[in-house]
Amino acid sequence: MSKVVSKMKSFLGFDEFEDEDEVMEEEEVMEEEESFAPVLSSKKNGKVVNIHTANTAKLMITKPLVYDDATEICTALKNRKIVVINTTSLELRTAQRLIDFVGGACYALCGELQEVEKGVFIVSPSNVEVSNELKSELSNKGMFNWASK
């Protein structure tokens, strides 16, 4: 009769002993969990970057004497330099051809070409924004607001 009672207890889950296979599996699971513990090191491998070198803008001021100087200007623009071009020493037709050539290169490189004064131009690459607010303000009001009220 005790066999019947023990079978009934084991069937209902009230048996007093554990299966050896279950004990071994639980130990293996615990060992696996312990083996995956994170390893923390006190040494940090941080990368130090100088933030001031990334935004260094270079400016080139040129006064071309011949049309062939346009290639030098376009190379500087391609290297992301801001170029100020003074064409006052060139003939009008040569200056116009030079500005047309530089303007085409500027368009191809997504840059910007603006006239600062008569015969003086600024060419900026795509990563530089040139504001023209002062020029429009000066043309409307003049340098000083001397108008009497």
Curated annotation (Swiss-Prot):
Which UniProt keyword terms apply here? Cell cycle, Cell division, Cytoplasm, Septation
Q: What is this protein called?
A: Cell division protein SepF
Gene (UniProt): sepF
- Tell me the compartments it is located in: Cytoplasm
Enumerate the Gene3D superfamilies for this protein: SepF-like protein
Q: How does it assemble?
A: Homodimer. Interacts with FtsZ.
Single biological process term from Gene Ontology? division septum assembly
**Entries under InterPro entries matching the protein:** Cell_div_SepF, Cell_div_SepF/SepF-rel, SepF-like_sf
Q: Which PANTHER family match?
A: CELL DIVISION PROTEIN SEPF
Write one Pfam family the protein is assigned to.
SepF
Q: Which GO terms describe its cellular component?
A: cytoplasm
Q: Which family would the database say this protein is a member of?
A: Belongs to the SepF family.
Function according to Swiss-Prot or TrEMBL:
Cell division protein that is part of the divisome complex and is recruited early to the Z-ring. Probably stimulates Z-ring formation, perhaps through the cross-linking of FtsZ protofilaments. Its function overlaps with FtsA.
